[in-house]
């Protein structure tokens, strides 16, 4: 799906089909010309199909939508069937095979997408645990390869928030992501 994302800032307003988009709102214009409007922030998605604002204190949700980026994230670190870390290729496969909330188009995030989840005010894990309660304070793979070696890819360490390159055969976890609204 090709989509255009427009973020308003300051005093700007955008008028589309007689609808006003205010500062801090996110809109997406899809190929079929449908318009999706979102307030800035997060929405928690529960396994039973219900949802709640990101500020809701419950932590039994299975996914979260980040309206600033338009991304939907699974909220639990993905490892092997025993919950252990895996190679980058195995993490990528596990993300692509994920079936969650009726969606089958999950994948691994890019370096920029995953690094944006790091919360510098937190430690072990360095991520907002009210939104991502199941993220382990360990290395998490991205889909971004390293320019200098096809044997390496980028990862984010959620223990302290580091971003670094790792050999693809090293062991880590994954956070699955997809574009919301698809």
Task: Describe the predicted segments one by one.
Residues 1-107, 112-182:
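Glycine-aromatic-enriched surface loops/turns that form tight recognition elements
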């Amino acid at each position: 799906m090709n989509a255009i994302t427009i973020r308003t800032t300051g005093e700007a307003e955008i008028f589309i089909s007689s609808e006003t988009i205010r500062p801090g709102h996110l809109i997406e214009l899809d190929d079929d010309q449908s318009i999706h409007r979102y307030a800035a922030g997060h929405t928690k998605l529960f396994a039973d199909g219900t949802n709640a604002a990101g500020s809701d204190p419950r932590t039994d949700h299975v996914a979260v939508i980040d309206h600033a980026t338009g991304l939907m994230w699974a909220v639990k670190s993905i490892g092997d069937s025993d919950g252990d870390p895996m190679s980058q290729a195995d993490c990528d496969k596990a993300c692509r095979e994920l079936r969650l909330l009726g969606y089958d188009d999950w994948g691994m995030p890019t370096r920029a997408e995953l690094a944006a989840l790091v919360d510098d005010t937190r430690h072990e894990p360095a991520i907002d645990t009210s939104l991502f309660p199941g993220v382990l304070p360990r290395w998490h793979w991205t889909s971004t390869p390293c320019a200098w070696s096809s044997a390496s890819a980028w990862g984010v360490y959620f223990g302290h928030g580091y971003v670094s390159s790792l050999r693809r055969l090293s062991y880590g976890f994954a956070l699955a992501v997809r574009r919301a609204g698809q």
